[in-house]
């Protein structure tokens, strides 16, 4: 398995656990590949402790050529937009007063072709804000308007990360809309909320993970370039969402093991999952600081001398907005006629909180990472 993919997975799990601590009972969703791409670009312009910290937090210790690795991943993932309604926007905006060095510009030109943009926060703040908002709105087909709130940038902003990611999935096998029914979703042991539950009987890759008393299933999207993996506890056994045991044992090694094909086998499954749309704006700064990014956000300690000779330059803010829509839509079902009367081998009824990832199967990179706790 490739070193960059392992690094990206480790960072994804670290940040997911931080976000779960911040929001133990709420829905969590982010795009790890967007954030790691943007921070890896910032690392190219960083030196000393700042560069080292980014490398440690992103687990780049064993990655030989980080920019080239991301160039390859970006190129592979960009091809997905012809198959899916998928947009992954990863921008690093730099104020023009920094006078970026020619070395930095040339070293980032190919690997980060569309990720770096020079703007004018200092003298044309409102105009620049409007340009960024319009640009993100256009790039996401109108899904995200006004991604920059009034207080997210000011005339002192030097470096800004903006991530915007959305995905409306089309399944390999579509769910029949007539089978979607309102059902109670158990948010904990005692409380329920109504949810539209999609139902299907078909063959899927599924397994049991006994150490965490949990089921895992792989649900492929059209063309099988992307899959959604769902980790569902067999029941709500703790006093919160039922996910405590999984969250405790979750790390990059266990996730890799759980999603390994050897953990699962093809089975006839009676499947029920919620139809949902989650839109999240997260502020990952505090989480990133907890993970060890101490220098990058402070003008007193950050070192971006690899991109500019200007002193006292820090990463001012990280804006990260994601939207995921899961519906019945998909390709024609290829189940054999009469499959309904086959004996069922297994059942997966996601009527209580679950953890999920959406993975690019070719590179095994995690595009979205989330937990669904409440409709």
From Swiss-Prot:
Cellular location(s): Secreted, Extracellular space
Cellular component GO terms, alphabetical: cornified envelope; cytoplasm; extracellular space; sarcoplasm
UniProt entry tagged with the keyword Secreted: yes
GO biological process: extracellular matrix organization; morphogenesis of an epithelium; prostate gland morphogenesis; regulation of epithelial cell proliferation
UniProt tissue specificity: Normal mammary epithelial cells.
UniProt keyword Ribosomal protein, yes or no: no
PROSITE patterns reported for this sequence: SERPIN
Pfam family, one: Serpin
Sorted UniProt keywords: Glycoprotein, Secreted
Matches recorded under InterPro entries: Serpin_B9/Maspin (IPR000240), Serpin_CS (IPR023795), Serpin_dom (IPR023796), Serpin_fam (IPR000215), Serpin_sf (IPR036186), Serpin_sf_1 (IPR042178), Serpin_sf_2 (IPR042185), SERPINB5_serpin_dom (IPR033836)
Domain of life: Eukaryota
SUPFAM superfamilies (alphabetical): Serpins
Site location (Reactive bond homolog): 340-341
Glycosylation sites noted in the Swiss-Prot or TrEMBL record: 99, 133, 188, 361
Molecular functions (GO terms): serine-type endopeptidase inhibitor activity
Complex and partners: Interacts with IRF6.
UniProt function note: Tumor suppressor. It blocks the growth, invasion, and metastatic properties of mammary tumors. As it does not undergo the S (stressed) to R (relaxed) conformational transition characteristic of active serpins, it exhibits no serine protease inhibitory activity.
Family: Belongs to the serpin family. Ov-serpin subfamily.
Name of the protein in question: Serpin B5
Organism name: Homo sapiens
Name of the gene: SERPINB5
């Amino acid at each position: 398995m490739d070193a960059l993919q392992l690094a990206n997975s480790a960072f994804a799990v670290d940040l997911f656990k931080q976000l779960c601590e911040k929001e133990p009972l709420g829905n969590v969703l982010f795009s790890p590949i967007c954030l790691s791409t943007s921070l890896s670009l910032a690392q190219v312009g960083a030196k000393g402790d700042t560069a080292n910290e980014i490398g440690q937090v992103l687990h780049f210790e064993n990655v030989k050529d980080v920019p080239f690795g991301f160039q390859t991943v970006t190129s592979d993932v960009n091809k997905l937009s012809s198959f899916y309604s998928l947009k992954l926007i990863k921008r690093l905006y730099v104020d023009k007063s920094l006078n970026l060095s020619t070395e930095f510009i040339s070293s980032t030109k190919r690997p980060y072709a569309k990720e770096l943009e020079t703007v004018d926060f200092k003298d044309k703040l409102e105009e620049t804000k409007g340009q960024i908002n319009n640009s993100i709105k256009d790039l996401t087909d109108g899904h995200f308007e006004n991604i920059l709130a009034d207080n997210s940038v000011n005339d002192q902003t030097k470096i800004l990360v903006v991530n915007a990611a959305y995905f409306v999935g089309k399944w390999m096998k579509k769910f029949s809309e007539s089978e979607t029914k309102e059902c109670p979703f158990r948010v904990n042991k005692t409380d329920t909320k109504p949810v539209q539950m999609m139902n299907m009987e078909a063959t899927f890759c599924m397994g049991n993970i006994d150490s965490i008393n949990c089921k895992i299933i792989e649900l492929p999207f059209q063309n099988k370039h992307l899959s959604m993996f769902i980790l569902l506890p067999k029941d709500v056994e703790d006093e919160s969402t039922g996910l405590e045991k999984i969250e405790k044992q979750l790390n990059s090694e266990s996730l890799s093991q759980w999603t390994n094909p050897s953990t699962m086998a093809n089975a006839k499954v009676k499947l029920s999952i919620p139809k949902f749309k989650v839109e999240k704006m997260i502020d990952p700064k505090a989480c990133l600081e907890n993970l060890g990014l101490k220098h990058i956000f402070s003008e007193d300690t950050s070192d971006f001398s690899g991109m500019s000779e200007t002193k006292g330059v820090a990463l001012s803010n990280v804006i990260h907005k994601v939207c995921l829509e899961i519906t019945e839509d998909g390709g024609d079902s290829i189940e054999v006629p009469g499959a309904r009367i086959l004996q069922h081998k297994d059942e997966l009824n996601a009527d209580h909180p679950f953890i999920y990832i959406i993975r690019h199967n070719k590179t095994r990179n995690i595009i979205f990472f989330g937990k669904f706790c409440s409709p």
